[in-house]
Amino acid sequence: PIKDSGKSVLGFGARRVYDDDRLPAKYVNTPETPVYKKSHVLYGLDLARANIGKKSQAVIVEGYTDVMAAHLSGIDTAVAACGTAFGDDHARLIQRLMGNSGSLNGEVIFTFDGDAAGQKAALKVFRGDNQFSSQTYVAVEPTGLDPCDLLMQRGPEAVRELVARRIPLYRYVMENTVSQFDLDRADGRVAAIRAAAPLVTSIRDQSLVDGYLRELSQVVGTDVDLVRREVSHTRRQHRSEPQLTIVPPPEPQQG
C-alpha cells in the first residue's frame, strides 16, 4: 500500500521479482487518481516523516523494496518517489519536513546506481539542487546493487555503509564529468574544465561559486585562476541561453 503522511492509503505498488515475470517495468503502481498525485507522494513517508524532521535527514532511494530494505537496515529516513522521477514538489515536501529556513542544517542523500543512467539522474538532481537549503549528497554502490539487493546479498550493514559513504553531490557530478578526459595532458585538462564549466555557471547561489571553482581546480589538478577564467568565458557565451541543459534519465514506466 502507498500511504500519505497521515497513513491513509492512496494506492498500491509492487516490484517485479523475477526477470521472466510478464511485467515490462521494474515497478508497477496505481495510476493517478483525484487523491493520488504522484508528484506529491513519497512512498514510506508515513514511516519516515517524524525521523526526517528529528534528524534533519532524508534518504531518497529508487523504489518500494529499497525503502523497505533501508528501514529494515536502520535507515529510518528513507523514502522513494512512486512511478515518477523525484521532482520539485517532492523536494519542497522534504524541505518542509526538515524545517529548513535557509541555513545548511540538514542533509538529503540520493542513492544512485554507478551506471550511465545513475549519472544522468545525478545531473538532473544537481540542476535542481538549489531547491534544498540542506546539503545534498550522493551514495553510489559501485557494483550496481540497490539497497534491496544489498540487504539480501550482504546484510543490513552493507546498506548502512552505502549511506555512510555518501559524497557531496557537486563533487560526484564534477568528478564524473572530468573523468571523460585525459588529465595527464594539458589539452585534456582544459577540455575537462570547459566541459564542467556549465555546471558552475548553473549555480544560482553566487555565494557557493568560489567553493565550486576551487573544487573543480582540485579535481582537474590545475590552477584555480585558469578555472575561473574558463568559467567566466562560458558565462559570457551563454548569458542569454538556459543555464544548463541536461537530458534526464527515462521516466519509470507506470502500471
Regions found by a protein language model. Give the residues of each.
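A charged alpha-helical hairpin associated with nucleic-acid processing machineries
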Residues: 5, 49-57, 72, 87-255
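Phosphate-handling DNA/RNA-contact segment within nucleic-acid enzymes
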Residues: 1-104, 122
